[in-house]
Regions:
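Short, charge-rich amphipathic alpha-helical segments embedded
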Residues: 260-284
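N-terminal signal peptide c-region/cleavage motif recognized by signal peptidases
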Residues: 13-15
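Compositionally biased low-complexity segments at domain edges in trafficked proteins
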Residues: 94-113, 231-268
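Flexible, surface-exposed loop/linker segments and immediately adjacent secondary-structure boundaries
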Residues: 19-155, 247
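Long, contiguous interaction/recruitment modules in multidomain scaffold/adaptor proteins
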Residues: 127-238
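Positively charged n-region of N-terminal signal peptides that target proteins for export
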Residues: 1-4
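Hydrophobic helical h-region of N-terminal Sec-dependent signal peptides
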Residues: 6-10
Length: 284
């Protein structure tokens, strides 16, 4: 009986290892490839979580940077190198030794929050969800994404798809009172100076046909002046000398604050976009 219990314990312990993230990808060269335990191969991308059994191939001259979640250390590998993820770290099979750096506690906390916020459903493959709805006739909003935090007092809307004939964009304040109505004449909608937006305001919005039928709806918040200033002043310049890890952490900070427009600019500078559930895909 004790032998049977030991086998059961070993089985469930192995399952736990197989489902628990071991490393968090911070940066990867364009040609770095991950192979999962099922033999599926895909590009290594920032924000991916790698589990026990993943293999990584780093070609010559390519760079691969990860956070080892158990130790809190950043490890940077330079190709040619072959790596494997074991129970609690990433192991170098062959290639130059990794360079090891500590990470600031605020960055570790942010990664922990990110993993909890964007936990990938079991069984889904990276990049399997769509970053944005496919092109088609149905009306959709590109900006502001529902729930966005705006870092400006001059909101602008960008739509895609079939615009309603003689449609209106209607804004409502936090009490549900109508704030502004703007005709939709193109995919780009801005507001005149008479629409006085203030820091810290919350809005819901609707696109309505002239006949009154609602086509689309959403919400956005304008940041407080202090929050907007803090996020904008923390901006990391996209220079050749800038570490991609620094851009990543700034993008994560913006994303978790809800400043999706600014975060998208950072993701683009890293050559990626995020799916609706926070998974990375490479920009083509």
């Amino acid at each position: 009986m004790s032998k049977y219990l030991l086998v059961v314990f070993w089985f469930f312990a192995s399952m736990a290892h197989a489902q628990t993230p071991v490393v968090f990808v911070l940066a990867a060269g364009d040609n770095v490839v991950v192979t999962n335990p099922k033999g599926q191969r895909y590009s290594a991308l920032p924000t991916q979580r790698l589990l026990f059994g993943h293999q990584i191939d780093v070609p010559k001259g390519q760079r691969f940077s990860v956070l080892v979640l158990k130790t809190g250390n950043r490890r940077v590998f330079t190709g040619p190198a072959n790596l494997t993820v074991i129970a609690d770290t990433i192991r170098l099979l062959n290639g130059p030794a990794a360079k090891v750096f500590p990470l600031a506690q605020e960055d570790l906390d942010m990664v922990d929050q990110w993993i909890k916020l964007y936990a990938r459903p079991r069984g889904s493959a990276p990049g399997s969800a769509k970053a944005r709805p496919e092109d088609g006739g149905e009306l959709d909003v590109i900006h502001p994404v529902d729930g966005s935090l705006l870092l400006t007092r001059t909101p602008q809307f960008v739509f895609k798809g079939d615009l309603p004939r003689e449609g209106n964009l209607m804004l409502f304040d936090s009490k549900g009172k109508r704030f502004w109505v703007e005709p939709i004449e193109s995919e780009y909608v801005s507001f005149p100076p008479a629409a006085k937006f203030e820091w810290g305001q919350r809005f819901t919005w609707e696109v309505r046909r002239l006949t009154g039928g609602r086509v689309l709806s959403g919400s956005f918040n304008i940041a407080s002046e202090e929050t907007a200033r803090a996020l904008l002043e923390a901006r990391i310049p996209d220079l050749p000398s800038t570490l991609p890890e620094s851009l990543l952490f700034y993008g994560m900070r913006l994303q978790m604050a809800g400043a999706y427009k600014e975060a998208d600019d950072v993701w683009a500078s890293l050559g990626i976009s995020l799916t609706l559930n926070g998974q990375p895909t490479r920009l083509r």
